[in-house]
Amino acid sequence: MNGSVRTDKTTWGELPHKFEAGTAPMAEAVGLGAAIDYLEAIGLENIAAHEHELTEYALGKLSEIPGMTLYGPPADRRAGIVSFNLEGVHPHDVAQILDLSGVAIRAGHHCCQPLMQKLGVAATNRASFYLYTIPEEIDQLVEGLYAVRKVFA
């Protein structure tokens, strides 16, 4: 914060206030409190269990798709994220076609180029699951991936 501002001179507030610009984020703090209350009411262990079930389900379904490469550890050692590639199809093409059917995933190097180099790929697809994801949405992802295979067959 500043102490005073004039056209010819500005003075700064005392420490630590001179490093805090603008209005304090009060609405954001209240929103964060509400989000914490919401998550605590559900229970973090319940959220983790749901995520694990979804990840296990997704890995099972995705592993049945011909030409599918899955990256990462088994379901019991990962969060609700699955990275994959579909043989012969660039990840951006996969993401674009899935988007047309209402399925949103990420495609690219995900800010981890050293890992992509280690895996020997330029990019991957990444699907994420959380509290609000339901198994039917994973089914929609899988159906979309079969459609991608048809386009590039």
Predicted regions and their residues:
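Pyridoxal 5′-phosphate
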Residues: M1-A153
